[in-house]
């Protein structure tokens, strides 16, 4: 974070602007909207600023900048056409520990101006830290188009009702849920349609019946996807933004966790093959306890909760204890990681089916049907199999799969650090040995398409490939794509 985002209350505070031209006028316009007491140090003013001075909206000092001008002001803006003067203002302000901005000179600023979306009292600031002002402006334009003009009215009405809601609903959780419901319901729709009187009546009615409608605690089982925060579903984002507490595992990326509601409690309940482990029974008991406390719990799991995620076991526990629950599916690693590696799971020339299996089973689980897994013309995806890669390769070859079958190990799938190492079934153990976890094993002729279809990260530039040729793919030329 290059700059700390902060909103300053300038109402009635003295602010010094050095300069009397168009650049100074633009900054002064913003300062006046914020209620600042604007003082202008300049020998001459342009027509716009002269009019403001005549109306006593700004205090014109009618002289060149002097060091004494900065002593009694809250912050300083240097907006003259004289660069040497602007930098002198900067150094004097710095020596007095006063916030200072030299317009269009990032190296001489202790604060900068963001692009602003103004729906007063709602304000949204967008900044590129001065690196790409045009990008910040484009982002502001997109946000302007997304946010309704009625947003300010909604905030003003809500502000008038805050005390009433606080008096009726005693806990922070109750109040937060109440407002979330209003901002996503009929109240918001009425304000959007400029029916503010009806909106306030709706608010009053909702508040009157809010205590009776409180449903207490619940658990939402949310699939976080394979890692890339952009692959989290909209429903999943809504759930983690409304959660009181989030129980997450080791496969949930930092990018996903950064989207969790800031005030929500976060509890790690993960499992790692070579390290920290939270017993599943403890996680189940924790979900039940938190829900019974009336909290909105999100059980956030990497990938999809019902694909080797023990989601079914967790829901059985909740059902047994009569805890309300819901499920938000996620993109499983076999789908996400292979797509980012340029490996299609099915392809009518090479694979008519895809099989997902886990390399980490219960001790009393039935024997694996290796004969079925060793079939050709299918794609085999193995979760949590890196530690058993040698055994997997041996058994598949024993049951008829060719040692020349293309194979890949995808680690850190869909994340910037994603690596895809390709080879054959014969050297699968070698590929897996150096792959960081989490890693996914993919076996099948479709792996041969990786070289042509890789598009993401380093693999998109042709790196991390074990040199192999695959006869089955010989018909695909550099400019040709299979159907």
From Swiss-Prot:
Precorrin-2 dehydrogenase /sirohydrochlorin ferrochelatase: region residues: 1-203
Residues at which S-adenosyl-L-methionine binds = 226, 302-304, 307, 332-333, 384, 413
Q: Which SUPFAM superfamilies match?
A: NAD(P)-binding Rossmann-fold domains, Siroheme synthase middle domains-like, Tetrapyrrole methylase
Cite the EC number: 2.1.1.107, 1.3.1.76, 4.99.1.4
What the record says about family reads: In the N-terminal section; belongs to the precorrin-2 dehydrogenase / sirohydrochlorin ferrochelatase family. In the C-terminal section; belongs to the precorrin methyltransferase family.
Q: Which reaction does it catalyse?
A: uroporphyrinogen III + 2 S-adenosyl-L-methionine = precorrin-2 + 2 S-adenosyl-L-homocysteine + H(+); precorrin-2 + NAD(+) = sirohydrochlorin + NADH + 2 H(+); siroheme + 2 H(+) = sirohydrochlorin + Fe(2+)
State the protein's name: Siroheme synthase
Gene Ontology molecular functions: NAD binding; precorrin-2 dehydrogenase activity; sirohydrochlorin ferrochelatase activity; uroporphyrin-III C-methyltransferase activity
Function as written in the Swiss-Prot or TrEMBL entry: Then it catalyzes the NAD-dependent ring dehydrogenation of precorrin-2 to yield sirohydrochlorin. Finally, it catalyzes the ferrochelation of sirohydrochlorin to yield siroheme.
């Amino acid at each position: 974070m290059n700059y700390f985002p902060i909103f300053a209350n300038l109402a009635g505070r003295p602010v010094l602007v050095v300069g009397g031209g168009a650049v100074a006028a633009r900054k002064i316009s913003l300062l006046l909207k914020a209620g600042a007491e604007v003082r202008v140090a300049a020998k001459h003013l342009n027509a716009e600023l002269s009019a403001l001075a005549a109306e006593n909206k700004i205090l014109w000092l009618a002289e060149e900048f002097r060091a004494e001008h900065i002593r009694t002001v809250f912050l300083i803006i240097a907006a003259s056409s004289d660069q040497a003067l602007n930098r002198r203002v900067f150094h004097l302000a710095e020596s007095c520990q006063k916030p200072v901005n030299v317009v269009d000179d990032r190296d001489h600023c202790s604060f900068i101006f963001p692009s602003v979306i103004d729906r007063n009292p709602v304000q949204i600031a967008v900044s590129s830290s001065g690196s790409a002002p045009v990008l910040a402006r484009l982002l502001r334009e997109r946000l302007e188009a997304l946010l309704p003009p009625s947003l300010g009215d909604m905030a003003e009405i809500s502000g008038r009702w805050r005390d009433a809601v606080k008096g009726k609903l005693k806990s922070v959780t109750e109040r937060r849920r109440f407002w979330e419901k209003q901002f996503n319901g009929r109240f918001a729709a009425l304000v959007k349609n400029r029916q503010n009187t009806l909106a306030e009546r709706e608010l009053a009615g909702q508040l009157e019946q809010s205590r009776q409608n409180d449903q207490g605690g619940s658990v939402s089982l949310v699939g976080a996807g394979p890692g890339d925060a952009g692959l989290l579903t909209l429903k999943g984002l809504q759930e983690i933004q409304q959660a009181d507490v989030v129980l997450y595992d080791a496969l949930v990326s930092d990018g996903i966790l950064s989207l969790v509601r800031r005030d929500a409690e976060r509890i790690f309940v993960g499992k790692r093959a070579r390290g920290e482990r939270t017993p599943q029974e403890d996680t189940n008991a924790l979900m039940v306890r938190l829900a019974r406390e009336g909290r909105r719990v999100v059980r956030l799991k990497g990938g999809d909760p019902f694909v080797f995620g023990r989601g079914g076991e967790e829901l059985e526990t909740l059902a047994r204890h009569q805890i309300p629950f819901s499920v938000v599916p996620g993109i499983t690693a076999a789908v996400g990681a292979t797509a980012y590696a340029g490996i299609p799971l099915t392809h009518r020339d090479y694979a008519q089916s895809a099989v997902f299996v886990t390399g980490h089973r219960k001790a009393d689980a039935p024997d694996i049907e290796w004969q079925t897994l060793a079939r050709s013309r299918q794609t085999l995806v193995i979760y949590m199999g890196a530690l058993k890669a040698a055994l997997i390769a041996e058994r598949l070859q024993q049951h008829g799969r060719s040692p020349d079958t293309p194979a890949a190990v995808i680690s850190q799938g869909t994340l910037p650090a994603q690596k895809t190492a390709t080879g054959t079934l014969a050297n699968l153990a070698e590929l897996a040995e150096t792959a960081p976890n989490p890693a996914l094993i993919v076996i099948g002729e479709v792996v041969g398409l990786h070289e042509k279809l890789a598009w993401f990260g380093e693999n998109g530039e042709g790196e991390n490939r074990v040199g192999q040729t695959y006869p089955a793919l010989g018909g695909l030329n550099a400019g040709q794509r299979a159907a």
